[in-house]
Amino acid sequence: VADCENHRVQVLSCDGDDGGISLVSKLGEEGSQPSQLKCPSDVAIDHDHDRVLVTDYRNHGVQSWCLSDQSLLSCVGRRGSGDLELNNPRGIAIDKHHHRIIVVDTFNHRLVFLSSIDFSFLFSVANQGSRPGKFCLPSGIAIDDDRHRIIVADKLNHRVQVLSSIDGSFLFEFG
């Protein structure tokens, strides 16, 4: 669970038959150095690579942590609008079919596609606007693996947009 105001990720477990939830561990602490977080906003679990991916909203980056031992694996991003630069990223999802990580780069009004192998920049889609395929403060993301779709909450346009997970092209919107 991304615990923004406490600057950490809480790893929880469902215990036993009663469905109780218990704290397993905590990742991160407040700060701007590697393994430190400033308002983590979303997490994605990548079981294929034994890691948890975290969008670090106020540090303008993405951190990768090992699921097994909770060690920091890597950090990418810094504030800006270039290829590996982010501006207050909110959401993150894993596109397993295309071996990509998709980051919701909220204040740059775009989605950033990274390689799930080495976090290299692949491409980005959209920028600010209200037309189909444009965003105004996108905030959340989900992947429909079966239909090869990306579902994005487009906050200030008050809609949800659906894009192709193949190339990020606009498919339809609702809301």
Predicted features and spans:
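Short loop/turn segments immediately following the C-termini of beta-strands
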Residues: C4-E5, C14, Y57-R58, T106-F107, ...
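Residue-level detector of Asp-centered blade-edge/turn motifs that repeat once per structural unit
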Residues: I45-H49, I94-H98, I143-R147
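Gly/Pro-rich loop segments of beta-rich domains
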Residues: G16-S41, L72-R90, F121-S139, D167-G175
